[in-house]
Swiss-Prot record:
A Pfam family of this chain: PPIase_AIP
Entry-linked InterPro entries: AIP/AIPL1/TTC9, PPIase_AIP, PPIase_dom_sf, PPIase_FKBP_dom, TPR-like_helical_dom_sf, TPR_rpt
Protein's recorded name: AH receptor-interacting protein
Domain PPIase FKBP-type as annotated: residue spans: 31-121
Annotated source species: Homo sapiens
Lineage of producing organism: Eukaryota, Metazoa, Chordata, Craniata, Vertebrata
Known outcome of mutating residue 271 to W: In PITA1; uncertain significance
Length: 330
């Protein structure tokens, strides 16, 4: 450990171990996944916190050898054992890019595209983007770089091949190969009744394809091919959302599909069920009518859904009448 700390110090990194880790130091070969919590602090007397992964509720996951935009994190992570807590004071040369990396991580934490604002910008927009990161603290740090302290807690170290990569960590080739496997895993989870977990798998597969699609010209054969792969996954995702009664999300996604593919029977059927669930009776009937028009063989299924809708409407009418009678009887 003394040798490691000495080498870090020569490179402008001061390590202070707060809690010793468990076992031997992993070899951290390329492809190793490190999961850790981090807190970034100013190195001045106040020690103001810039970012804290615990406050966001999810630890950081770093794949060694993937050329992460902040190389110093890979350097310091590779000196840690599982369970270790340590602080690293890093010279300016190591943290110049931190504001840009922090912006991407903050975007990810709130569900935004990590590259938001960095692609397809006109000249004026790019100038504005370069002048501001959208966060006052990051703007100040970018304009006046200073050493930073990283407080790190190593939660888990996984060797290559022992874990499934998150979509954001994959190469384009890895994403394309992973989609069918993630799709199958989602189907298995759904069959076993793990609906929320299945939805998460479908979401991951969609994220992979969306990321690939963003690199293609909209409307091009490649873009359309990817979109046609996304559609069945999105329908599976909608089925999960129907089961967990998140109907408005189903309405949004099915409508987006039908705006592009107005002959998609499954999208009409799922949207019809969602409309029925939120008492949009006319819209539900219209969608079910469209299902029959496109595929008359589904008449028994549609009839069952319409009977269920009519029964719910009658029950609701009776409940409303009883409620009003109660109001006016006082």
């Amino acid at each position: 450990m003394a040798d490691i700390i000495a080498r870090l110090r020569e490179d402008g990194i001061q390590k202070r171990v707060i809690q010793e880790g468990r076992g031997e130091l992993p070899d951290f070969q390329d492809g190793t996944k490190a999961t850790f919590h981090y807190r970034t602090l100013h190195s001045d007397d106040e020690g103001t916190v810039l970012d804290d992964s615990r406050a966001r509720g999810k630890p950081m996951e770093l794949i060694i050898g993937k050329k992460f935009k902040l190389p110093v994190w890979e350097t310091i992570v590779c000196t840690m054992r599982e369970g270790e807590i340590a602080q690293f004071l890093c010279d300016i040369k190591h943290v110049v890019l931190y504001p840009l990396v922090a912006k991407s991580l903050r975007n990810i934490a709130v569900g935004k595209d990590p590259l938001e604002g960095q692609r397809h910008c006109c000249g004026v927009a790019q100038m504005r983007e370069h002048s501001s990161l959208g966060h006052a603290d990051l703007d100040a740090l970018q304009q006046n770089p200073q050493p930073l302290i990283f407080h790190m807690e190593m939660l888990k170290v996984e060797s290559p091949g022992t874990y499934q990569q998150d979509p954001w960590a994959m190469t384009d080739e890895e994403k394309a190969k992973a989609v069918p496997l993630i799709h199958q895993e989602g189907n298995r989870l759904y069959r076993e009744g793990h609906v929320k977990e299945a939805a998460a798998k479908y979401y991951d597969a969609i994220a992979c394809l969306k990321n690939l699609q963003m690199k293609e010209q909209p409307g091009s054969p490649e873009w359309i091919q990817l979109d046609q792969q996304i559609t069945p996954l999105l329908l599976n995702y909608c089925q999960c959302k129907l089961v967990v009664e998140e109907y408005y999300e189903v309405l949004d996604h099915c409508s987006s599909i039908l705006n592009k593919y107005d002959d998609n029977v499954k999208a009409y059927f799922k949207r019809g069920k969602a409309h029925a669930a939120v008492w949009n009776a006319q819209e539900a009937q219209a969608d079910f009518a469209k299902v029959l028009e496109l595929d008359p063989a589904l008449a028994p299924v549609v009839s069952r859904e319409l009977r269920a809708l009519e029964a719910r409407i009658r029950q609701k009418d009776e409940e409303d009448k009883a409620r009003f009678r109660g109001i006016f009887s006082h």
